[in-house]
Structures are given as C-alpha cells and as structure tokens.
C-alpha cells in the first residue's frame, strides 16, 4: 500500500526510534554481518612503512593525460612535472577526504533516522567505515604527500543538500546511490593507474567497504520507493538528477592546473569541460550510478530527457549493484604485495 503524502512526510521528518528488535534474516542483515567480518585497522593493516620515491610520479596512464599535450606542461622541468603530479593527486584525494567526512556525517544521521532496526545497525557500521576512510585518506595526504586542498564548492553544495534534507530516504539516495556510487567508480579508476603500492592498497580496502555501502542502499531503497505515490517518486527522481548535475561539477578540480600551467580558474574549467577524455572520465563515473537509479525506479519519464541531455542514459542497462558476489566479498584482506590491479 502507498502512504499518503502527509503521513509519509511525518515519518521522514523525525528521528525514528524502533522498538521492534526482531532481526530480519535478509540481505541487509547479511551485509551488516559481512561488514563486521571485514573490519580492518587503518593504522596496522596498511603498509605505512612504504613511501613512494620522491622522483617518481604517483599516477601513470598508458596514454598521455590531456594536460600533457599542452605547451605550458612541456615547458615544465622534470622536477616541476613531478611536483605537478603530487599536487594533482593531492587535489583529487583532498576531495575524496572531504567527501568521506560528508559520508561520515550522513551515515551518522541515517543511524538516527532510518526507520528499521536492521537499517540502523547497518548505518552505524557504515559510520565506523567512513571514519576509517577519513583517517586513512588524511594520513596519506599528511604523511606521504604533504599537500592539502580545500573542499570543492560543488562538493560542499552537494553534501549540504543531503545533510540538510530532513527526509531519510533522500539522504539514502544522495549518499548511498550518488556519492558512494561515484566514489566507487573514481576509487577503482585511481587504483588502476596508481604506481604507489600503498595508495593502491588503501584504495582497494576502501573499495571493498564502498561496494557494501552501495549494495545496501539499493537493496533498502528498491522496495521502499515502490510504496510512494507517483508524485513522491518524481520528487525523488528530480532530487537524484540535481545531485548528479552538481556531481558532474564536483569532478572539475582546477587548482593544480592554475598553479602549474598558468591557467585562470575559468580557463582550467573550460579546458576540462571541452576535452574529450575528461568528458569520457566524468561520464564513466556515472556508469555506477545510472543503472542503480534505474534499478530503484528513479529514472522516471520526467527526468529521462534530462539525463539524456547529460549523455548519461547510455549507462541505463549497465550492470547494477543490487547483486553482489558474496564469496568475493568474504575473501580475506589481500596483503600489501598482492593487491589485484
């Protein structure tokens, strides 16, 4: 049965006690148990004794990065190119750090306002996961790079949008589907081009956690959204679309290019917006978001043309994250030298 809008609103806008402690033996419970099995300690399970050589790049791709074709980059000395690489990585990872702090805050809110016992337990376990992610990203930036960048205004806007909305399910959509889905794709891509084995190990462990978070969000939201009225579903679909628009802007980081390539902020932004490989990178990240929005019923007729205009509907039929490989997820943590590519 569908809830009335007013009744639903009352449920969304209050902190939610749940005095029914019946443990539902379902996928949410299994994900919670899996999280307990796979807890790792950021202080001792990562090889902090390793430091990447100062004269080597942290990231390296098979093809040239777009900025490497510019005359301003070619004019840099070898030492300046290495320093640019460090700043580029620091700017990107600083946004990861800020995003993980946002995820920490939202997960703690979900433990308070999620309506069911199982969801509260899972949100509490995710809160600890996010705290661990903040810890390890911050330590890597502080100890291994020594450079820190402030939060991207678009990311701050997205986090504020999610944190200040009083409806628990919009927090789920914004965090578990949009932000965590984008993070999962971004972390996977960065891991694939990292030449620093410590960074590769760090990202691999974080990715294992994030995969559980996204699967939790999809499994919990799919059934709930079916109980909403068409108007409420469209409202959430519009929220998801707006979050995706902000997220595309979040993916544009300009500070390191301004510093080393002599670009203005607008020039650096336009360069990234108008460079095909950057566009492909941004769109690729949504390959982990769009199929999940489709799975939970938020690619409505009203928002489909808007996603089409962004060039993102091509991912609609890509694999979603509803199902997970339980055997793969239960594997013991890989050792430092054995992290898969």
Predicted segments with their positions:
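Long, hydrophobic, well-ordered secondary-structure blocks that form the structural core
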Residues: 103-164
């Amino acid at each position: 049965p569908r809830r009335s809008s007013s009744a639903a609103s009352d449920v969304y806008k209050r902190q939610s006690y749940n005095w029914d402690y019946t443990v539902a033996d379902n996928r949410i419970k299994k994900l919670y148990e899996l999280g307990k099995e796979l807890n790792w300690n950021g202080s001792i399970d990562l090889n902090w004794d390793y430091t990447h050589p100062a004269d080597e790049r942290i990231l390296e791709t098979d093809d040239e990065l777009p900025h490497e074709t510019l005359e301003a980059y070619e004019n840099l000395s070898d030492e300046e190119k290495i320093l640019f690489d460090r700043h580029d990585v620091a700017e990107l990872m600083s946004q990861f750090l800020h995003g993980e702090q946002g995820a920490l805050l939202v997960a703690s809110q979900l433990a308070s306002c999620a309506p069911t016992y199982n969801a509260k337990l899972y949100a509490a376990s995710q809160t600890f996961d996010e705290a661990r992610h903040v810890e390890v990203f911050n330590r890597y930036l502080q100890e291994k790079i020594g450079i820190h960048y402030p939060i991207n205004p678009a990311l701050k806007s997205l986090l504020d949008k999610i944190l200040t909305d009083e409806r628990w399910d919009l927090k789920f959509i914004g965090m578990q589907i949009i932000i965590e889905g984008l993070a999962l794709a971004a972390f996977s891509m960065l891991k694939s081009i990292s030449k620093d084995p410590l960074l590769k190990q760090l990202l691999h462990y974080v990715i294992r956690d994030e995969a559980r978070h996204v699967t939790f969000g999809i499994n919990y939201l799919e059934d709930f959204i079916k109980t909403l009225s068409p108007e409420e579903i469209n409202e959430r679909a519009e929220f998801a679309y707006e979050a995706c628009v902000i997220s595309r802007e979040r993916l544009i980081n300009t500070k390191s290019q301004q510093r080393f390539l002599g670009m203005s902020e607008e020039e650096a932004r336009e360069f990234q917006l108008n460079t095909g490989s950057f566009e492909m990178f941004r769109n690729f990240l949504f390959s982990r978001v769009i199929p999940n929005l489709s799975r939970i019923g938020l690619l409505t007729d009203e928002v489909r043309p808007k996603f089409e205009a962004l060039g993102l509907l091509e991912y609609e039929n890509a694999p979603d994250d509803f199902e997970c490989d339980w055997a793969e997820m239960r594997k013991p943590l890989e050792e430092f030298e054995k992290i898969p590519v």
